Amino acid sequence: MTLIFAVSKRTDFDYMAFADQDDIWLPRKLYAAVDKLKDSGETASLYGSNQTLYQDGKEGELRFSCPLDTSLKHHINRNEVSGCTMVMNRKLVTAIVSRPCPPANIIDFRIHDAWVALVAILTGTFIYDPNSYILYRIHENNTVGIRKTSIKERLNRLLLRGNNGEHRANLRSNTASVLLEYYPDIDEEYRAVLEKYAYYRKSMKYRLALLRDKEIIKATGENPLVFRLK
């Protein structure tokens, strides 16, 4: 995330992309992204795409076979669009760096690409391309994604905790609170979603609203009973 803030001081760019050294870009990766973003005008816009799995020097199947959900209710819980596929226009970069860098505990858990996706949804648009223009390497050192998870990671997931031990419910609530603080002028529909997460521990009104929201419960990917008990 600090790289975005550092590079953004330059003014001679129209688009910015993440680049992971592990992955293999196919020839049309940036062309495809810019083609989707070029008509965004003054709208803060993010592009993300599917990936082709790549292991032991062999191309596999697409990572995702179905269209991904790019709604706020989904992304406040989990981000499935990898940063290595993301390209953002200058307007989105400005929307990100015009606010403070998000707290470390949020970035450590959600990772920078999840924050970028959330800001894009709140302030502009998130374009998902079901096609793949990148080979996604699968190996033991992948930070997130397809690799086999450790026993510790599986236990943390079972206990609904991030890898730093903090409860996922707290992290989602903290993320929502920071987004509300940083972006107070968002649409009321988005504000209502974030307020449920940000205030449900302090307000019965928001707690009931969160527990009754079937779309949010589905988006968590968690057992509904476990979600309601948190």
PLM feature spans:
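Nucleotide-sugar donor-binding/catalytic module of glycosyltransferases
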Residues: M1-S150, G162, L229
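C-terminal subregions of glycosyltransferases and related glycan-biosynthesis enzymes
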Residues: R99-N105, F109, R137-K230
